[in-house]
């Protein structure tokens, strides 16, 4: 058997973030077929626990999960525009990878550095959406981010995408060079070892006990939303749904901003409960005990939370928009227009009346697609096609 090809993943977020978890998924997908390495671009913001122990040079560490880990440090991603370059070149020359795989376009400024350090290596960029590029046209921060950090993304040799919708949007924004480059939609995996249905379906009594345990008393059911406070997430519609159904508890997981606090207070939404964050096991229990996952986002590059909820045995209702439509059409109810709060509320009524709103066959097909097995096959298929 010949030597395995080397692949180096480059990520700037820790393993508790979505990009960090995705990097670990990619390492898991390839480590049996490739000599796998990861370069963590570390900053105090995303690796605070390691700041005191950081070393002046990258010291490779063999991880028990089957890969070699390297690291370089900067004070922030922005200072890393200069500070990451030289130490990253050093790592690249030491590893001499056949493939350099960047986890997100915000690291595009490093693509030319990788090409300079390893001219024969193929560079791959994972594109997740174009929100940073298109949603904030008047923001100086995002203008600079696009100009200096993201634009060089088009210099990569090939691209992978989380959805067909993202691929289309990226082609429109980045233009012909990306559109004509080799590429593949590889999706995103869910952690099926964590997000799965209990052995026995959760009973109505168990749901009520769970609500009481978490401070939600005298409600007929519970809805769940997991999201950032961004305009594209359409949280206002979720809160309007709460106003329409005051006898149901509406849980939101995410930062409780001043804007959201004002909406809750102005509408006197005593049935809205906020949790800033959960650990993974806590989130699974909320998924399992909710009556309905509500995901009214206008724009999503993929949309994992409703898929995770369905994997846990809980129905979802989503907006018929962007990649959510691509993934969930035919699986669960989709609402259009996305801000029709009454339409979401009617789906809730059907569920509380005992109706099944999920197509079981379509859901199984979706969960198979989002399994690590399916994800690994697509990643490896793409890499093998690149030679």
PLM regions and their residue ranges:
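Short hydrophobic beta-strand element within catalytic cores of glycosyltransferases
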Residues: 315-318
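Conserved acidic donor-binding segment of nucleotide-sugar-dependent glycosyltransferases
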Residues: 333-342, 349-355
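Conserved donor-binding/catalytic core segment of Leloir-type glycosyltransferases
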Residues: 8, 216-233, 242
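Membrane-proximal helix-turn-helix segments that form the acceptor-binding/catalytic region
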Residues: 89, 141-159
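Nucleotide-activated donor-binding/catalytic signature segment of Leloir-type glycosyltransferases, i.e.
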Residues: 260-284
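Aromatic "clamp/platform" in nucleotide-sugar-dependent glycosyltransferases that forms part
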Residues: 298
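Active-site proximal beta-strand in glycosyltransferases
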Residues: 99-101, 114-135
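Short alpha-helical donor nucleotide-sugar binding micro-motif in glycosyltransferases
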Residues: 285-290
């Amino acid at each position: 058997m010949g030597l395995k090809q080397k692949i180096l993943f480059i990520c700037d977020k820790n393993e508790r973030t979505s990009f960090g978890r995705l990097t670990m998924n990619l390492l898991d997908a390839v480590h049996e077929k490739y000599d796998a390495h990861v370069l963590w671009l570390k900053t105090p913001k995303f690796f605070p626990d390691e700041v005191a122990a950081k070393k002046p040079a990258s010291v490779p560490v063999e991880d028990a999960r089957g890969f070699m880990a390297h690291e370089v440090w900067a004070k922030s991603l922005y200072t890393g525009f200069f500070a990451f370059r030289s130490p990253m070149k050093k790592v690249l020359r030491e590893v001499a990878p056949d493939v350099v795989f960047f986890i997100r376009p915000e690291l595009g400024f490093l693509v030319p550095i990788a090409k300079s350090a390893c001219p024969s290596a193929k560079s791959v960029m994972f594109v997740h959406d174009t929100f940073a590029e298109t949603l904030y046209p008047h923001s100086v921060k995002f203008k600079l981010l696009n100009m200096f950090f993201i634009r060089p993304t088009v210099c990569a040799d090939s691209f992978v995408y989380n959805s067909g919708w993202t691929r289309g949007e990226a082609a429109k924004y980045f233009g012909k060079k990306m559109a004509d480059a080799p590429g593949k939609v590889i999706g995103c995996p869910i952690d099926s070892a964590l997000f799965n249905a209990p052995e026995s379906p959760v009973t109505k009594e168990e749901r009520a006990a769970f609500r009481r345990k978490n401070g939600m008393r005298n409600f007929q059911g519970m809805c769940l939303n997991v999201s950032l406070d961004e305009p594209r997430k359409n949280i206002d519609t979720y809160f309007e749904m709460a106003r329409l159904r005051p006898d149901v508890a509406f849980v939101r997981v995410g930062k409780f901003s001043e804007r959201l606090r004002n909406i809750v207070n102005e509408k006197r939404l005593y049935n809205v409960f906020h949790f800033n964050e959960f650990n993974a096991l806590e989130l699974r229990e909320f998924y399992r005990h909710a009556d309905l996952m509500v995901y009214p986002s206008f724009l999503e590059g993929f949309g994992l939370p409703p898929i995770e909820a369905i994997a846990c045995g809980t129905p979802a209702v989503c907006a018929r928009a962007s990649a959510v439509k691509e993934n969930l059409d035919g699986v669960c109810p989709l609402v259009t227009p996305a801000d029709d709060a009454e339409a979401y509320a009617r789906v809730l009524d059907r569920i509380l009346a005992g109706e099944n709103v999920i197509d079981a066959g379509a859901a199984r097909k979706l969960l198979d697609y989002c399994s690590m097995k399916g994800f690994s096959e697509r990643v490896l298929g793409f890499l093998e096609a690149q030679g």
